[in-house]
Each structure stands twice: as C-alpha cells, then as structure tokens.
C-alpha cells in the first residue's frame, strides 16, 4: 500500500518515517492516514482556531473536548456544539442528515449531559431546481425522522438558499444538553489499568473511511460512495442515551468518548493521548455485524450509536448489567496502559504499534493566502440600479423569496415540544428553553451571512457573529459562549484560503471585542466540485442566559395601540443584502463592519429593557432590512402598523438596508417614557404605532396585512 492511497503527501510520509524510525506497515499506514486527514486533524485550520478567545467567566469546558460547557447557575452546566455532515448529506440526503443528528447528540452525551435541544443550519441550492427540492426533502425528512424518534426537540435553525450550494448542500447539526456540574464527563480522565468498553451497536462496514471521504472535494466517484454513508437507528440511540445517563448517575464511568469520524480508532486514540496513557486494543473482541471484516475496516468503520467507555475493573460488572438491562451490546475491547503506545492485537498477535502522539499530535499546514483577484468586482455596486420605483412591490417580492418566506414546510416535520421545556421554538428569531428545576432560561441564536462573507470575508463573518449576539441581547440574555461550524472550499487554493483566514479573523476579533468566548466548533473544508464551490459559510450558534424566564422579550407580541420604536441607526448598508441580491442576481457590495462600542451600548440597553419589561415585543433588524423586520412583526402579531419614518436619501436604503446594531420594539404608551430613558445616549426614534389591518409606511406604501401575510407564507 502506498502513502497516497491513504491521502498522505510525500512530505508527510517522510515525517512519519522520521517519527517511527521505520516504515509503517499497511495497517499502521491506514490508521495514520485517517488521523492525519483534514477531517480528523484540522491541520489546515488549527493555527487559525488558536486565535479564538476561549476563556470566560462562564466557561467550564472550552475547546478540546467533545463539546463546550458553560455555567447556567444553580448547579447546572450547558453542553453544546455544532457539527457538519455535508458530504454524506450530498450523497445520501436522508441518512446523511439523520446520522448527522445522531452524531452530534452523542457528543453531548459524552460530556455527561442529557441531550435536550437540537437545531440545524441548512444551505440548499437554487430553490427552483427539482434537484434542490429533492435534496432538501431528503435532508429535512432525515433530520425530522431521527430527531423526533430519539426524543430531542428541534427548536430552531437557519435555512438559506443559493445556487452555490447546488452540488454541495450544507447540513450543520447542533445539539445541546444540561448536566449537573458534579456529573460532567470527560475524555481526558482515563488511567492505566482501566478497561475500554464498547457500548451500543455492533460494528459493520457502513461509514468506512468516512473521514477521508469528507476530506476531499465531491466528484462523481465520491457521489457513488454509498458504503461511506452511515446508517442510523434513533431507537438504538435513545437506549444509548438512557443507559449512559444511568451509568453516569451511578458514577460507573471513568471517561467517555463518542465514536464519530474514524470510529474506534479516533475515540480510543484520543482518550489515550488526552489522558497521557497508552491503550491496547484486542480487535477480535469488537462485536461485529459482518464476520469477515478486516482490522482496518473495523477500526475505520463509522457505524452509528456507539460509545467508548473507560471503566475501572471493579465497576465492570454493574456496567455490563446496565447494558443488558437496556438491551445494548457491551464488550471489553482493550485496556489502558502507561506505555503511551497505541497497540492493536488480533488473537494475541501484535498487528500495529504506534506512539499515541503520532495519532494525536498531527502536523499543521499554513497554506499561502492571496486576496481573490475578483474581490474588487465582488465589492463593486451601482446604487442607481438599486433604486426602488415601487417599494410595495419590492417588499411583496422579497417576503416570499426562498430566503424570506416562513419555513413552515420544514418546521412542521419537527417535534419542538418533546421534553416539554421549549418556551420559544421554530419560527421565532431566538430559541428559548427552560433550565431544569430553575426559573432560568437558556437562549440560542443561529446565524450565517454567506452573501456578506463572499463580498468581504472579514466583515461578513464579523456581522454574522454580531447579529447572533444582538438576537440574544434583545431577549434579555447575556452571552455565555459560542460554537461554530466553518464551511469552506479547498484551503489549498490561495484565494480560497484567504477567505477562510479572513472569516476566522473576523469571528475572533468580534468575539474578543464583545466578550463572547468560543467553546467548541467544527471545520468542514473541500465543499466544492470541479465546476463550483460554496460561498464562505461560517455558521455561529451563541448561547445566553436569562436569570428570570418571565423577563424575556420575544417577537410577535405587538399589541394594538403600542408605539413602534426603532433603536439604532435608521439606515445600514445595501451591500450584499437580500434586496441587492434580488435586484442584481448575485451578491455585490460591502457591508459596514460592526462597531464594537455601538454593539456594547446596544447590549447594555437591550438587557435593561428586558429586565424592566419595558417592551411587549422586540425584533432585531436583519435579513431584508427594516421593512422586513416590521412586516414580519406585524404578520406574527396579527396587527397592522402605521410607520412614519422618512428616508434621508433613497427609500430603498431606509427600507431594505442591513447591518448595524438595530432593532424594533413595540412599547405600551404608559411605558414609553421609561423606554426612551433606558435608551438615552443611543439612537432611538418613535417610528409609528400599531393598530388596524393595514401595514402602511407614510408616503411610501400601504398594504393590507392579509396580503402581506399571504406573501410571507407562500414560496416564490
């Protein structure tokens, strides 16, 4: 077997020989090749990921574990992470998406947390194509089928359409769970003499080499790679969840690791390396679905619904009894040692022996970066072409566009209320769930700005992060931490690596400026084909805390007679907006970078507004601009509005510009003076009043609310 067959470069192979002092055998080469793959090693992004701020007063566990954990107070932690399942979902939409949900749930289990929340970020191609509709149908059905059956509510997400995702749909699965602080688990606490126990499904050939599959661009051969797609069983996962929760409650587990990419290999080598131990694996003891599997197939299989437990000898018997109670396979497959060696035995014969460091301390690559030659063209914009001759018509066309209309067809397939702790779910700007046994609430926002990242990677990523935080602050939640899924094309092309590097710089700078640590994340590269590539798509999910869940501000609660306020600058930028893209047919123009001081001023006042309950309803100005924010609020509340704001220049800038710390609030007249006082020192203007059955903007447009609602709920 040659090194190129396992995805290694010549320089990497030479480095392996130097580290080992010999040439690896075929099995060792397979093991190293997978662990050094982009998907497992993050070799192209680790230097950049280290620039993220990772410490904060609420951070209990930062990057480097199965998921990040933040402190929710009253003895509760919140474990959360988002992860990609892009390539598998492009090849087998239903199973690819379903197993993406299952995999991220097991990351949460591995922290000792009960999975309590799921969300998904979905990026599809041209909505008018039958191919896109087929992919979207399979992906959404896969998510709903698995999530509903396993009993974890899907409480929100983000869905975005653009032709750049025609051949590369993105499926970013988020999961989270609550854990008592004294029951947190870790993958770094194994000790020599402990036993490695495989719990869950038998190992088969599904998903073999899935990590390598996800480390290269999609082509016709890879699209035919069905064996590299895992097959999920949500009912087995449900049993696995309950068994692991019981084992943790009884303190029977010393350490734990999900079996995700690279299966048994990655889980066992990561536990050994992180714990400073070695491990001896007995391959013949691994329960198999197919008797003729070769050692490399067994180690690289990504069969689902499996966990690797590290168990002290005296606790083996109750662990096996618990597994039997739940009807799960359970087997001792290895033992921790003090050798710092990763050894594979088959029937007593040593098949492979490697230092754990060669599997855990993988090499890094800092690719050359060069500004794309067409970046100035991407940023050029002719404002005269964007003039709105008929604002009412433009608004009615934007609301039903793929990125504007309600996503009921997706949400209705998801169970958002199972577990009975969802306060605000799909269709609301922020998801809100109860913290168990307290009066607290956890708030989650998910954002991505592909258009803006395409025309200006640094500013686009900064705006996505700031937008996610604004959504938290408006509800009354202070940010505890962020997780991200970084979806990009090949890092090997300097212009594409520039986009990656600048997006990550934008995220890091914004998180640092606005005091939001990064606690976990995922990187997905090579999202491209021979003919197309995705826009840079960093997706962020931010978690926040409300101490009193009765003091949150939600959208869609405007009442007749309320004053409508706009806080923040009346106008933003038209560059790379939903309106601009609709007019020009492609994203063009730059957006304004977030102003850290303005963002902090917005944060402080938004938190005060929620704590004092000075508004009945609130909504951040985001995609589609001020007109979309007000129209969505009127539709959701079932009440008309009369808006009196006058444009400074072109009406399209007032109505449809995006960016900046801006929001609309609905305030009862008796609280108006106190609301205005709370926003003193920050732009705040009374924009109009709620009431009636029409959405009117004085001198600009008048539309029946019924017509507006119909446009919003119809697909264009």
Predicted regions and their residues:
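Alpha-helix N-cap/helix-start motif at coil-to-helix transitions, marked by capping-box chemistry
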Residues: 7, 234, 597-600
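Residue-level signal for secondary-structure boundary elements
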Residues: 24, 28, 40-44, 57, ...
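Non-catalytic terminal/interface segments that mediate subunit docking, oligomerization
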Residues: 36, 40, 49-99, 103-105, ...
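Short, hydrophobic beta-strand segments that form beta-sheet elements in well-ordered domains
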Residues: 38, 154, 176, 664-667, ...
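Mobile "lid/hinge" segments at catalytic clefts and subdomain interfaces of large enzymes
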Residues: 65-326, 332, 336-341, 345, ...
């Amino acid at each position: 077997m040659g090194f190129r067959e396992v995805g290694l470069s010549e320089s990497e192979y030479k480095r392996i020989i130097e580290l080992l002092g010999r040439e690896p055998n075929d099995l060792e080469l397979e093991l190293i090749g997978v662990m050094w793959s982009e998907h497992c090693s993050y070799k192209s992004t680790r230097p950049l990921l280290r620039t993220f701020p990772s410490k904060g007063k609420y951070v209990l566990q930062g990057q480097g574990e199965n998921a990040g954990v933040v402190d929710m107070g009253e003895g509760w932690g919140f474990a959360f992470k988002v992860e990609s399942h892009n390539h598998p979902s492009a090849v087998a939409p239903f199973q690819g998406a379903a197993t993406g949900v299952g995999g991220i749930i097991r990351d949460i289990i591995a922290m000792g947390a009960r999975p309590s929340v799921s969300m998904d970020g979905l990026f599809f191609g041209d909505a008018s194509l039958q191919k896109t509709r087929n992919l979207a149908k399979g992906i959404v059905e896969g998510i709903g089928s698995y999530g509903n059956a396993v009993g974890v509510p899907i409480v929100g997400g983000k869905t975005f359409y653009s032709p750049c995702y025609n051949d590369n749909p993105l499926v970013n699965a988020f999961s989270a769970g609550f854990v008592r602080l004294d029951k947190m688990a870790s993958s770094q606490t194994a000790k020599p003499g402990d036993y490695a126990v495989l719990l869950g499904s038998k190992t088969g050939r599904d998903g073999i080499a899935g990590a390598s599959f996800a480390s290269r661009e999609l082509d016709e051969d890879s699209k035919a790679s069905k064996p590299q797609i895992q097959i999920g069983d949500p009912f087995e996962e449900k049993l696995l969840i309950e068994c692991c929760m019981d084992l943790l409650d009884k303190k029977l587990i010393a350490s734990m690791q999900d079996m995700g990419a690279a299966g048994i290999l990655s889980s066992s080598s990561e536990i050994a390396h992180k714990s400073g131990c070695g491990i001896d694996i007995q391959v013949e003891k691994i329960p198999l679905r197919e008797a003729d599997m070769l050692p490399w197939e067994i180690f690289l299989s990504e069969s689902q619904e499996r966990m690797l437990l590290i168990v002290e000898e005296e606790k083996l018997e109750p662990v096996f009894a618990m597994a039997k109670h739940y009807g799960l396979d359970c087997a001792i497959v290895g033992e921790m040692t003090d050798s710092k060696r990763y050894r594979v035995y088959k029937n007593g014969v040593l098949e492979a022996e490697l230092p754990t460091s060669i599997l855990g301390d993988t090499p890094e690559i800092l690719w050359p970066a060069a500004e794309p030659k067409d970046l100035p063209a991407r940023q050029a914009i002719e404002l005269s072409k964007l003039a709105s001759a008929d604002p009412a018509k433009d608004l009615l066309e934007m609301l039903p566009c793929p990125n504007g209309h309600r996503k009921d067809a997706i949400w209705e397939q998801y169970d958002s209320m199972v577990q009975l702790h969802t306060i605000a779910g799909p269709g609301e700007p922020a998801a809100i769930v109860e913290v168990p046994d307290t009066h607290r609430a956890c708030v989650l926002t998910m954002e991505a700005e592909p258009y803006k990242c395409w025309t200006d990677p640094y500013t686009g990523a900064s705006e996505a992060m700031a937008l996610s935080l604004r959504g938290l602050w408006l509800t009354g939640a202070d940010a505890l931490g962020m997780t991200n899924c970084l979806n990009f094309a090949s890092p090997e092309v300097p212009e594409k690596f520039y986009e990656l590097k600048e997006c990550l710089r934008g995220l890091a700078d914004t998180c640092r400026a606005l005091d939001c640590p990064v606690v976990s994340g995922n990187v997905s590269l090579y999202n491209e084909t021979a003919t197309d590539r995705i826009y840079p798509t960093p997706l962020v999910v931010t978690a926040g805390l409300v101490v009193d869940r009765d003091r949150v501000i939600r959208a869609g609660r405007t009442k007749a007679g309320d004053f409508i306020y706009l806080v923040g600058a009346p106008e933003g930028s038209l560059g790379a907006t939903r309106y601009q893209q609709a007019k020009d047919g492609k994203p063009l123009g730059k957006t304004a970078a977030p102003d850290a001081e303005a963002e902090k001023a917005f944060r402080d006042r938004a938190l005060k507004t929620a704590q004092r309950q000075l508004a009945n309803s609130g909504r951040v100005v985001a995609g589609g601009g001020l007109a979309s924010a007000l129209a969505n609020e009127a539709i959701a509340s079932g009440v008309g509005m009369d808006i009196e704001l006058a444009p400074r220049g072109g009406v399209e800038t007032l109505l449809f510009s995006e960016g900046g710390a801006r929001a609309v609030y609905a305030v009862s007249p008796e609280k108006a003076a106190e609301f205005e006082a709370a926003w003193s020192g920050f732009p705040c203007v009374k924009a109009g009043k709620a009431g009636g059955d029409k959405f009117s903007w004085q001198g600009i447009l008048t539309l029946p609310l019924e017509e507006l609602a119909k446009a919003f709920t119809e697909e264009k």
